[in-house]
């Protein structure tokens, strides 16, 4: 510790994170931050409006930069869960949104598009979500078996949480 530069983390926060935030603010400037914020709100409201016909919308009002869906509207038997939707999104090349949060929304799916996403990407996401809703109505097995295009198929999340394997082992 004799040649240490000293403590990197204190009660004010982690220095590296604070530097990233400061760099972002200085790079964007006042006008850039306003534009990014406006675009984030616009993107979230656009997606919310596009998806509310196929997915439950527990809070149907203008949102900020994110919104929460409450599962599929037409899944009367409750067989298709939010986790199935998220896993199917992996097959379609999308990183799935946060699932099951907030806890007060049944089958919650928190969608938070970034401010840098172009409309084309948002429309592709909408098309994927609508396709998933259609698959839930017509052929639930596609969703219940997803993902099929990833290296790891469908792990048991409960078992994985209970018995963490934190080391990499090359396959047989």
Predicted regions and their residues:
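Non-catalytic terminal extensions of PLP-dependent enzymes
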Residues: 4, 25-172
